[in-house]
Amino acid sequence: MATERYVVAARLKPGKRAEAERELEAGPPFDPAELGLTGHAAYLTDDEVYLVFEGKAARSTALRLAQERLTDVARWQGMVSGLPARVAEVPPGARRLYDWRR
């Protein structure tokens, strides 16, 4: 199975950028290596957050995390509007706050 890259984006609620920045700089609430990922990164713009998952089953890993880590999902629901959506890439102007590589 080839390495997969799965990128999701979520729109920040007004006034939540600083809180999101602190969360992202702290890194993920899980161990990417234990999940079989080969890369994981977080990016931020003025109004959106981007999460990048890389590995053999990146998409299914990201979806499983969303289902299993409900406390973390609930915390992010206070910072973002609506549901995250898959996007093709992180925009060039986004600032990388976290980057892990195996």
Give the ranges of each region predicted by the language model.
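Short, flexible turn/loop "capping" segments at secondary-structure junctions
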Residues: M1-E4, Y43-T45
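Short amphipathic alpha-helical segments
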Residues: L12-T38
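A short beta-turn/loop motif at secondary-structure boundaries
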Residues: E34, A41-D46
